Swiss-Prot record:
Protein name: Somatotropin
Listed PANTHER family: SOMATOTROPIN, SOMATOTROPIN,PROLACTIN
Gene3D superfamilies referenced in this protein's UniProt entry, alphabetically: 1.20.1250.10
Secretion signal span: 1-22
GO annotations of cellular component type: extracellular space
Keyword tRNA-binding: no
Gene Ontology molecular-function annotations: growth hormone activity; growth hormone receptor binding; metal ion binding
Name of the gene this protein is made from: gh
Subcellular localization, as worded in the UniProt entry: Secreted
Function: Growth hormone plays an important role in growth control and is involved in the regulation of several anabolic processes. Implicated as an osmoregulatory substance important for seawater adaptation.
């Protein structure tokens, strides 16, 4: 009888530990999603402010440029849209988000200092790294050689009124990438959610 009680207490303790780890994981996912939503909103606000400062003719000219523009992050293999993201594994979504955030470490310094974007990106990257570590169970982790050495282009070097095209590209790419990361983290969070009715 004593063995049964010991075994039962081990099983109960194991379940409680597992449930606690799940809640901690959910808390970390919530924090990551909130942080990237804030960055996406900041990017949208910066873009709106930039466009409002343009003359109508400049605005018209720049709107033709971006669809043809190349973003630094376009070289990162990533799901195209929400449908493809929903078919990807949580670990792949986290890896992709990590690499997208990492690709902005240097360029974010050129975005000015609205609420310290570089610091917010570093915090988010660290949080995603913790989530990756928590998801890795016998799977390949994020190795040092898996980190991105960004191929910076000239348009990532300057954000100034003197070069509207470069500034517009930088802000557009930042906004686009924060939207991607927000989508990927939201899908991953939903997949790991205890709520079976989690929808995006």
């Amino acid at each position: 009888m004593a063995r049964v009680l010991v075994l039962l207490s081990v099983v109960v303790a194991s379940l409680l530990f597992s449930q606690g780890a799940t809640f901690e994981s959910q808390r970390l996912f919530n924090n990551a999603v909130i942080r990237v939503q804030h960055l996406h909103q900041l990017a949208a606000k910066m873009m709106d402010d930039f466009e409002e400062a343009l003359l109508p003719e400049e605005r018209k000219q720049l709107s033709k440029i971006f669809p043809l523009s190349f973003c630094n992050s376009d070289s990162i293999e990533a799901p195209a849209g929400k449908d493809e993201a929903q078919k990807s594994s949580v670990l792949k979504l986290l890896h992709t988000s990590y690499r997208l955030i990492e690709s902005w470490e240097f360029p974010s310094r050129n975005l000015g200092n609205p609420n310290h974007i570089s610091e917010k990106l570093a915090d988010l990257k660290m949080g995603i790294g913790v989530l990756i570590e928590g998801c890795v169970d016998g799977q390949t982790g994020l190795d040092e050689n898996d980190s991105l050495a960004p191929p910076f282009e000239d348009f990532y070097q300057t954000l100034s009124e003197g070069n509207l095209r470069k500034s517009f590209r930088l802000l557009s790419c930042f906004k686009k990438d924060m939207h991607k990361v927000e989508t990927y983290l939201s899908v991953a969070k939903c997949r790991r959610s205890l709520d079976s009715n989690c929808t995006l």
